[in-house]
């Protein structure tokens, strides 16, 4: 089974934006390379972290940024309320700017703190468990230099700690921070991108005061703060565009603990809860248009592929089809749970947690 099949209708088409034909397209496909005569905007790379358990991963993440063909102006590691870790990073990473999270606990506050400490015209967000290829910034900056483009994201490939389970459906790879089946296979204007490897213009980010600090990832709780940011910027920046590039310039680690059916279910429940919260904040139509398309087109196609695989002798196809049905059902339950409990809740911080 291939995990990279695309929809007949791209997410950009569904959003009413379509595929952009711009001067950066040859950069996005690797056609032009990195020219010395290209005046790239300055970019600050912001990496949030919170635990010493990710120390080796952080080293590899920082090294991948230092190896970029287009150098970053600065690399800022933001430590989320862990003074000992901040001190150690400051000592062990002499070429990195280490700063504390001066906002609310969690990755949204950490990213906002990183932006406040940065100087670049563009801010790039990278997770501490991700590894960028050397052309990551070159490819994405090619898009963000295009008039009207406020931000850009890219394909994130899975770096599995244990073998990928045969039952795991590619349509739900987003639950583990990896790009999922059905995404556009050409540079496309989309509703939102993801913060595991996002570039955004500082001016646009500051226009909406950054991420909501009571809505995002805190420990094992994970809400769609990246989608919320993209929607809020699009609402205030007239004719602004978010770009998606399918170039595989990012790898995201998938710990063995996330390669389980239990994690998939808990993550989907929380995502449904978060989408309901976001619909309340940003409007139902804007917040759920792509999700409704995903549920109506991408998931049924995935179930069909799994059944077809099983008919050809790949019994694991039944597992993938069953997992799609179960995961979608749990996400719907999470959405419904938010609606039931919302009269008694004051803020998103009361969200349930996903299992690690």
PLM-predicted stretches and their roles:
Residues 101-118:
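Glycine-rich, basic loop-to-helix element that forms the pyrophosphate-binding segment
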């Amino acid at each position: 089974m291939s995990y990279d099949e695309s929809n007949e209708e791209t997410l950009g088409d569904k959003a009413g934006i379509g595929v952009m034909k711009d001067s950066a397209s040859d950069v996005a496909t690797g056609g032009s390379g990195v020219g010395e005569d290209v005046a790239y905007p300055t970019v600050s790379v912001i990496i949030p972290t919170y635990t010493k358990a990710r120390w080796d991963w952080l080293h590899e993440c920082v090294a991948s940024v230092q190896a970029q063909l287009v150098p970053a102006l600065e690399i800022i590691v933001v430590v989320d309320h862990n003074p000992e870790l901040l001190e150690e990073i400051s000592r062990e990473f002499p070429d990195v700017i280490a700063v504390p999270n001066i906002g609310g606990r969690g990755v949204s506050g950490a990213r906002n703190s990183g932006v406040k400490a940065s100087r670049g015209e563009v801010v790039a967000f990278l997770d501490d468990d991700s590894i960028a290829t050397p052309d990551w910034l070159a490819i994405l900056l090619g898009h963000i230099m295009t008039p009207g483009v406020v931000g850009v994201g890219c394909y994130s490939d899975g770096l599995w700690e244990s073998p990928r389970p045969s039952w795991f459906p590619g349509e739900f790879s987003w639950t583990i921070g990896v790009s999922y089946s059905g995404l556009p296979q050409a540079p496309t204007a989309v509703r939102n991108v993801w913060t595991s490897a996002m570039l955004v213009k500082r001016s646009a980010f500051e226009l909406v005061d950054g991420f909501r600090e009571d809505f995002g990832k805190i420990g094992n709780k994970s809400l769609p703060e990246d989608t919320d940011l993209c929607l809020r910027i699009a609402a205030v920046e007239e004719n602004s565009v978010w770009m998606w590039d399918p170039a595989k310039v990012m790898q995201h680690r998938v710990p063995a603990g996330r390669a389980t059916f239990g994690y998939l279910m808990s993550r989907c429940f929380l995502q449904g809860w978060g989408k309901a919260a976001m619909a309340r904040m940003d409007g139902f139509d804007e917040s759920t248009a792509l999700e409704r398309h995903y549920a109506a087109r991408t998931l049924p196609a995935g179930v069909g592929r799994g059944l077809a695989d099983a008919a050809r002798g790949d019994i694991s196809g039944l597992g993938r089809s069953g997992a799609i049905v179960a995961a979608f059902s749990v996400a719907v339950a999470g959405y419904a749970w938010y609606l039931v409990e919302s009269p008694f809740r004051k803020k998103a911080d009361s969200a349930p947690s996903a299992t690690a």
